[in-house]
Amino acid sequence: MHLLQCLLSTISLASTVTAFVPYSFNLEVSTEGPPSNDVARRFVPWKLLLDDSYNNHGSSSNGVSLTLDLKKFPVRRDNKYKVVLADEPTTPNTAALNQEGLDYSYFATVRVGSQGQQMWLVLDTGGPNTWVFGSDCTTVACQRHETFGEAASKSLKLLPLNWAVGYGTGLVSGVLGTDSLSLAGLDVNMTFGLAKNASTDFESYPVDGILGLGRSANSNFNTPSFMETVATQRLLKSNIIGFSFSRNSDGARDGAANFGDLDTTRFTGDIVYTNTTGDSNNWRIPLDDASVNGTPCRFVNKTAVIDTGTSYAMLPPKDATVLHNLIPGAVTTSHGQNFTLPCNSTAVVQVSFSGLSYNISPKDYVGPAYGSACLSTIVGQALYGDDVWLLGDVFLKNVYSVFDYDNHRIGFANRSVPIASPTTTVAAAANPSATDGAGSTLTGSMAVHTGSASIVSRFVHWPFIFALLCMVLV
């Protein structure tokens, strides 16, 4: 975004594609659009298009609702969310990566402001911008989350600038402010957004905001990003982040993000790096190829955006079709947009970078049951054009990934085999103390995040797909 636009009354939060929405909507999304360098961050939820029998009103010709009952999860009751808390790490500068129990989203506890208010933020390499729900927000989505404002921090300085982020059915918008953020032993003073309005997209989702860890040094506020501030203050010996994502079915609560150094206990073999390519907005690297059961797909001139804020893998429809054609029993629906496959698939799916291949486990690419088959979590969506993939947590759960800000590269190694942790159901106290960490007060695998409002319990349909970005800059 140009400097002049940053001085306008509304600032768009992000400029890279990412995916992150708890609901699915009946939206028309183009899968064949050309790539654009001038897009603002937008989370666009969409519905699965299973076959041509579905009409534009969200139902089939037989009157069956398009909304898929993939899995019902009681995410909120009396302003509480059930989540799986990761074990508190013992290594320095490391944050526990919690999740909601479906491998759908991962988030860390960040302390905000002079009183160190605990908030759950997605650590998102898809963009450099950071925002939290503000205390001035009165929408239901905000009331169901922890909020932050002047009453919670004597050091908060509000700025006369606004921002807005577009969603499929609404907006999240607010003001900018400057205050301290503390994560993994790193204390950073920076500018971030405080949401004053939020659409229904976040009503049933656990997170209180997003911490942008994109490759760009500056956010779209034209202010330094979190990692740029860390680098300027020389808080780490190396400006790198290593991610290890938990898989809930493994029974281990070992998700973590470590800053400044490699955690050699979390991977086997060597880290092999690939230099980034393209503009500085994305963590994008050249993709060698993909294969199924050893048969190469023979993709050429492809690149992949590696995004911790995206749940699934999104490939251009033609590429997704080629890959699924090699999986025994896979069936293409929706013109290469969505796929079904055998629920007991054992096909070995691999992607290759810098001459090495990495598995995507059937535990990750086989999604929820649909009829006699299961849905594939590898989706046909051309978010950046016909030659760019978006690889999210479906892939990242299989590797230890390193984002190297100093040398502009991404490294992978195979994850260590996780060891299952004992599980205990516990509840978090309302308004958790600023002096008690999540690991010290919430020691079990199931915990409850508590806010200030009382909301009636309800079940929600969790979506099958994370979402995308498409709002064009004015």
Swiss-Prot record:
GO terms for biological process: proteolysis. It is a lipid-anchor; GPI-anchor. One of its GO terms (molecular function) is aspartic-type endopeptidase activity. Residues 106-413 form the Peptidase A1 domain. Induction: Repressed under nutrient-rich culture conditions. The keyword Protease applies. The keyword Iron-sulfur does not apply. Gene3D superfamilies: Acid Proteases. Residues 453-474 form a propeptide. Its main location: membrane. Residues 1-19 form the signal peptide. The active site is at D124, D307. Glycans are attached at N189, N197, N275, N301, N338, N344, N414. A lipid is attached at S452 (GPI-anchor amidated serine). Optimum pH is 5.0. Keywords: Aspartyl protease, Cell membrane, Glycoprotein, GPI-anchor, Hydrolase, Lipoprotein, Membrane, Protease, Signal, Virulence. One of its GO terms (cellular component) is plasma membrane. It comes from the Eukaryota. It is found in: Cell membrane. Belongs to the peptidase A1 family. Secreted aspartic-type endopeptidase which is secreted and contributes to virulence. This is Aspartic-type endopeptidase ctsD. It comes from Aspergillus fumigatus (strain ATCC MYA-4609 / CBS 101355 / FGSC A1100 / Af293). The lineage of its organism: Eukaryota, Fungi, Dikarya, Ascomycota, Pezizomycotina. The gene is ctsD.
